Amino acid sequence: SAASDTELNEKFVSGWLDKENNPVPDLFEFTKCVLRIPEAHEMIARYTVLDEDAKRLILLRPYQIHAIEAIREASKTGKSGYVWHTTGSGKTLTSYKATRNLLMDIPSIDKTIFLIDRKDLDTQTTMAFQAYANNDLVDVDETDNVNDLKKKLKSEDRQVIVTTIQKMQILISKRLKEDTPEYQKIKNLKIAFVVDECHRAVTPKTKRELERFFGRSLWYGFTGTPRFAENPYPQLGDLPRTTEKLYGERLHKYTIQNAIHDKAVLGFQVEHNGPKNVADETDSSVYNNETHMLRVLDIILNKSYHKLGFQNG
């Protein structure tokens, strides 16, 4: 049945966008993109999530769908890549669906692994990931320890595994003996890795080590802050220094500008309170002056108290 007025949150209603994040206002073009067969079936079967915690059915936004489709197309030809989606735009949901759909869509993939950094274990990312998985058709299992990870990798079950980069490193470097059946079995798995916060979760050195062990692996990174030539990884031998060199081509982009335009994230409130009657505003001594700094603190702590919501803690 249709949702009641109290259940449909208009804040989350959005128009359709094409792959380049351009609005599609034409009704017939929208119908062709979304409502014809098999697109309409896929929208329901592949791009909805039942959030166990919120007790809501979530329909993915267009940019999330385009990113997942781009990953699927890349995987068909054995290519890796990365997705640049701004912070706050729902990367966790997108990466969950990408991880899940890879396992369901590509029969040659034995397992998909959602890889996170240990310090992110108890964050909203993993809690949200598990909430999405509770009512899914695919088994999504977290790993309690390295032995548990090894057991899940040895299992014949095709499954989504959520684990940390640290456990994976320990497994391949210390817990597997070469030339044993379990070593060969795990080493020969066809695995698709989906990496959250890929700009920092897996270093170029660690990724190379994992790729050399899992020679048949695919890699898909999600980040809101990619590494470019302007902000590269530190130089370390011949290791890649940008996100594109590390993961492959960018598969989809949804920047902060796109998100603010679509009201997918909150915009910025900018106010200028600079020094007055100053001949040279580029003179750093003006801003290092104690009188000026105290005035700035007064504006932030006292005059912006309610505006910035400090009263709410």
What are these model-predicted stretches?
Residues 89, 119, 140-150, 165-170:
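Conserved helicase motor
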Residues 66-70, 94-101, 148, 164-167, ...:
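Well-ordered alpha-helical segments embedded in enzymatic catalytic cores
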Residues 1-113, 120, 124-135, 156-159, ...:
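ATP-dependent helicase/translocase motor core
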Residues 113-115, 220:
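Conserved hydrophobic packing residues within short motifs/helices of P-loop NTPase cores
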Residues 279-313:
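Conserved helicase/translocase motor-coupling segment
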Residues 146-161, 185:
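Conserved motor-coupling elements within RecA-like helicase/translocase cores
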Residues 135-140, 263:
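Conserved AMP-binding/adenylation subdomain of ANL enzymes
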Residues 1-10, 14, 165-283, 293-294:
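Signature of the SF2 helicase/ATPase Hel1-core->accessory helical subdomain module
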